[in-house]
C-alpha cells in the first residue's frame, strides 16, 4: 500500500497493525510523488489499473488483467484524480458508472480479480482468524497471538 504525497505516519501504523493481527505480506509506505511511483512501476514492466467510474466496465476487462502475468498496481483515486492518471494507467476500469467510495471500488475489483477465492485465503503469521458465522462474531486467536 502506497500513500503518495503525504507523510501521515498514522496511515502506516494502521496498516501495520492490521498486518500484525491478521497476517499477510502487506507493505506500506508514505511520501513520494504519485507520478514517479506510477512511472517507475510501469518501467519495471508492471501494469497499472486505475479504478474509476469512467473506465471500461470491470467484467469486460478483468480476464485480460488477470491473465497478463504481470505485477499489478491498483490506483484508487477520489474525485480530484489528476488527469494524467488516466493517460498513465494501463487500464482505466469502472466498477460502476455511478459514484462510489474508493474502498468499495477496491473491494469489488479484488473480488473479481480473485474470483471469490479471497474467502478461503489463509494469511501467514495471523494472530487472529475470522471464522464464518451465521450470527455474531467468531474469531480464533492462534498460538502466534500470545507473542
Model-derived features: where do they sit?
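Long, charge-patterned amphipathic alpha-helical coiled-coil/hairpin "stalk" segments used as oligomerization
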Residues: 55-95
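A short acidic, often aromatic-flanked loop/helix-cap motif at beta-alpha or helix-coil junctions
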Residues: 33-39, 56-57, 99-102
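Long, charged alpha-helical interface segments
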Residues: 134-147
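RNA substrate-binding interface of SAM-dependent RNA methyltransferases
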Residues: 1-52, 114, 118
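Short, low-complexity, polar/charged sequence segments that are solvent-exposed and flexible
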Residues: 20-22, 47-48, 67-71, 93-96, ...
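Short, flexible active-site-adjacent loop segments at beta-strand->alpha-helix junctions, enriched
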Residues: 54-55, 134
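Structured adenosyl-cofactor binding patch, chiefly the S-adenosyl-L-methionine
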Residues: 85-128, 134
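Gly/Ser/Thr-rich loops at beta-strand to alpha-helix junctions
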Residues: 6-9, 80, 99-101
Amino acid at each position: 500500500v502506497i500513500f503518495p504525497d503525504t507523510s501521515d505516519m498514522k496511515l502506516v501504523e494502521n496498516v501495520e497493525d492490521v498486518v500484525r493481527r491478521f497476517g499477510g505480506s502487506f507493505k506500506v509506505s508514505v511520501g513520494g510523488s504519485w507520478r514517479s511511483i506510477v512511472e517507475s512501476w510501469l518501467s519495471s514492466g508492471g501494469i497499472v489499473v486505475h479504478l474509476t467510474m469512467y473506465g471500461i466496465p470491470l467484467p469486460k476487462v478483468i480476464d485480460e488483467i488477470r491473465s497478463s502475468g504481470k505485477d499489478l498496481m491498483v490506483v484508487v483515486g477520489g474525485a480530484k484524480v489528476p488527469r494524467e492518471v488516466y493517460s498513465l494507467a494501463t487500464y482505466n476500469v469502472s466498477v460502476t458508472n455511478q459514484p462510489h467510495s474508493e474502498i468499495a471500488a477496491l473491494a469489488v475489483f479484488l473480488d473479481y480479480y480473485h474470483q471469490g477465492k479471497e474467502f478461503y485465503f489463509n494469511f501467514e503469521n495471523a494472530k487472529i482468524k475470522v471464522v464464518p458465522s451465521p450470527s455474531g462474531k467468531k474469531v480464533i486467536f492462534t498460538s502466534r497471538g500470545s507473542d
